[in-house]
Every structure is written in C-alpha cells, then in structure tokens.
Design a protein with these regions (language model features):
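Catalytic phosphate-handling regions of large nucleic-acid enzymes and associated NTPases
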Residues: 16
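Alpha-helical architecture feature
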Residues: 3-11, 19-71, 80-87, 98-255
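Charged, solvent-exposed structural "stalk/scaffold" segments
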Residues: 92-98
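Membrane-interfacial loop-to-helix junctions in multi-pass transporters
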Residues: 76-77
Length: 255
C-alpha cells in the first residue's frame, strides 16, 4: 500500500491535481505490473515525461504505453531508458521532436549497446547540434550539402537530416576516417559514436519504424500485463490483486 500511496504523492508533487492522479494511477499500476518496478519509480518516470514534453492528462496512458513499448521492442531496460530520457527529453521538446521519436532514438542506441546516460547525452547532443549548428559544425554540414533548417528558419525533421548526411557520405564516397572527422566536427568527440548509430538507424528506416510502433502503442501495457497473467498464472494474480486493492483504496479516500 505504501508503494501506491508513494506513487500518488509523486504524481501530486509533479503538479498533478486530482484529475492527474486519477489519470496516472491506473497507468502507473499497469506499468509496475508489466516492468516489475515499483509504482513510485514508474510514477516518477511517467510524470517526468509528461512535464518534459508538456503533455496533458489525457495523454498519460499513451506516455505509459510508449515507455512500455520502448522496453518491449528495444534492448532498453527501465533504468537505461529512464536515465536516457531524463537527459534527452527537455532538449527534444525544444527541438520539436516528439516523445515517440525520442524514445525511438533512445531505444536504437540501447540496441547498439550505448545505454543509460550515454544514450541520453548522445541523443541530446545530436538534437542540439542539428537544431542550431554553429562555427565548424555549420561549415561541415554545408560542405555535405545538408540543410538543418527550412526557408522559414524552422529546424527540419531530425531523422531527415540524419538520412541526408548518410546519403551525402555515400554520394561523396567518403571513407570511414573522413566520415569520422565529419561526425566529430558536427556532433563533438563525445557524441560522435551515438550520432553514427542514429544516422545508420535513420537511414535503414529503423527510427521511423520504431516511432510508428510507439505512436500506435495505445493499450499495449495492458496487453503485456494480460500476457504475463496467462504465462505466470497464480503468483502474478496474487501480486496484481494486492496492487489493485491499494489503487481502489486510494481513490475511495479522495472522493
């Protein structure tokens, strides 16, 4: 019971009113059942993403499903995804990149063994460097013939820019050493390996595929819980009913 109460305190501390608590509690419960982390940990991640991407209460269930599917479809685990998104989300929001696209980037990096805060800082560097390239980075992109903003000065879609960079490398027949130089100049030494992974994932269509799967993820957390119920049987049902009893108690107290 402490866990669910703690989760609701976290939701409230994150600026959640009664509506937010009612929207987020069942989502947090299902996430905890699906990923076996505490409701408090799940509430903190859920509300962190809600606020970073400035999403409304009616999007809370969708955020939960996007997070569940990121762990389901990529090598990202709870801690890795949580750390990575904490770093990347605020910059992504500023760059006009959606939660689904950000989760796709973080997931693709985990698949390539770039995990946790490294995936977060890598994604963040790629987004911020492409949003407002300066100095040598700007010159390097110009040499490659890649534009980062449209005629109105808005940042072009990040996946498109990454695809065009890859295409330019191929068209200009740049060797691996030359490519590495460009990547370092544009993205910085630290983030260049993450940028290379994301560029490849953009070019193969992996980022688009993951983004599409995450956009269509509504109801997937509940599905995962149902599958676990079928596979784990009695033990899981006891665990679940204990959790759900707590959820209903808390709602009754509020009303």
């Amino acid at each position: 019971a402490d866990d669910a109460a703690g989760a609701q305190i976290i939701i409230a501390k994150a600026g959640g009113d009664v509506d937010a608590i009612q929207a987020a509690t069942p989502v947090t419960l299902n996430m905890a059942l699906a990923n076996r982390r505490t409701m408090e940990e799940n509430a903190a991640l859920l509300m962190g993403m809600k606020s970073a991407f400035q999403l409304s209460n009616d999007k809370v269930a969708h955020i939960g499903d996007v997070l569940s599917m990121t762990m389901n479809k990529t090598a990202a685990d709870f801690d890795g995804m949580s750390d990575a998104l904490t770093y990347a989300a605020p910059v992504a929001k500023n760059a006009g990149v959606s939660i689904e696209e950000t989760a796709a980037m973080v997931g693709a990096l985990h698949d390539a063994k770039i995990t946790g805060s490294m995936a977060g800082t890598g994604s963040r560097a790629v987004l911020s460097r492409l949003q407002a390239p300066t100095g040598k980075a700007w010159d390097a992109l110009k040499e490659l013939g890649v534009k980062t903003s449209d005629s109105k000065g808005n940042t072009r879609p990040v996946f498109t820019i990454l695809k065009e960079m890859q295409a330019s490398f191929e068209k200009n027949r740049l060797g691996t050493a030359q490519q590495a130089e460009y990547m370092k100049t544009i993205f910085g030494e630290e983030a260049s390996s993450a940028a290379a992974v994301l560029m490849a994932a953009a070019s193969t269509g992996k980022l688009d595929k993951l983004t599409a799967a995450f956009k269509a993820s509504d109801g997937k957390t509940a599905e995962l819980v149902n599958i676990m119920q079928d596979n784990l049987g009695g033990d899981f049902k006891e665990f679940q009913s204990a959790y759900e009893a707590v959820g209903t108690d808390l709602f009754d107290q509020q009303e």
